[in-house]
Regions:
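Alpha-helical transmembrane segments of multi-pass small-molecule/ion transporters
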Residues: 1-279
């Protein structure tokens, strides 16, 4: 949870007037990007989990990570891919706020369907989930934003330091969970790894197609592909292990595997772009 708070504070320190102006300046790109993050990805996750006949705990975990947009490194990946960095910041901010309301609804619907199909009872305290998202997402985001407005120079310095620490911190968190649930991850890696890999690739392909249909610029298309593919694993893990919500490390396992695979796949995507442009 502390890592999630730091990541959201970091996002807040990076928000500027341009991020909000971009919503009105480039509404089509923002709308398509948010739709890909909030609607497309959870839908693909649900379909994959159903087709692969995943156990309820992993079914919920896969949909959960799909409902947590706004990866902490998406802006860096967008820059490396020569995408629209301003759009990346806007999408991360907007989706982080929108998910406060969409995540509880989607997870509540998923829990009902999974409970009915599996013949078990999965209780999801929607109110507590909403409150936790406010405390862990919205509050630190706003604190970071106000800090930038109050002390812009110091905020910029803090942002540079936190940006260097964010990725290693997230990977450390994933590693600690991996060590704690090593045997279970190994036993189920084929199923969960396949589901996460297919989810990432399918979401990237669908978001690219969506962007092309919308006739967005090449830079915007690349950014949307990255934004849709990169998720906030820290948020998913915080919800999964929270004693007020799922209180289950098993639900967090898809998020852990997703976090590892998404960086490998997106780095490969960025490398392929850079390699193609050198020719």
């Amino acid at each position: 949870m502390p890592i999630l708070i730091v990541l959201m504070f970091l996002l807040g320190t990076e928000l500027n007037k341009e991020a909000f102006v971009n919503v009105t300046r480039n509404p089509k790109a923002v709308l398509l990007g948010v739709a890909g993050q909030i609607v497309l990805l959870p839908a693909i996750a649900f379909i994959l989990a159903w087709l692969l006949d995943m156990p309820p705990v992993y079914f919920m975990g896969l949909v959960l990570i799909a409902c947590c947009p706004g990866g902490s490194s998406s802006n860096v990946f967008s820059m490396l891919a020569k995408g629209d960095v301003a759009l990346s910041v806007t999408l991360t901010a907007v989706s982080s706020i929108v998910t406060l309301f969409t995540l509880p609804v989607i997870m509540e619907l998923t829990s009902h369907i999974v409970s009915h199909n599996a013949g078990i009872s999965i209780e999801l305290p929607v109110g507590k989930l909403f409150v936790q998202n406010i405390v862990l997402l919205f509050v630190p985001l706003m604190v970071g934003w106000f800090f930038r407005r109050w002390k812009p120079i110091q905020a910029s310095q803090v942002s540079k330091v936190l940006n260097k620490l964010a990725f290693p911190a997230l990977m450390t968190l994933a590693l600690l969970f991996f060590l704690q649930y090593t045997q279970e991850i190994i036993d189920n890696f084929r199923l969960i790894g396949m589901a996460c890999g297919l989810l990432i690739l399918a979401s990237m392909a669908c978001s690219s197609l969506l962007s092309r249909i919308g006739r967005l610029t090449q830079a915007a298309r690349r950014t949307i592909v990255i934004e849709v593919g990169m998720q906030n694993a820290a948020q998913a893990i915080a919800i999964a292990v929270s004693p007020f919500i799922f209180n289950s490390g098993e639900v967090a396992i898809p998020a852990i595997i997703y976090a590892l695979l998404m960086n490998v796949i997106l780095l490969t995507y960025v490398y392929a772009i850079r390699l193609r442009e050198r020719r």
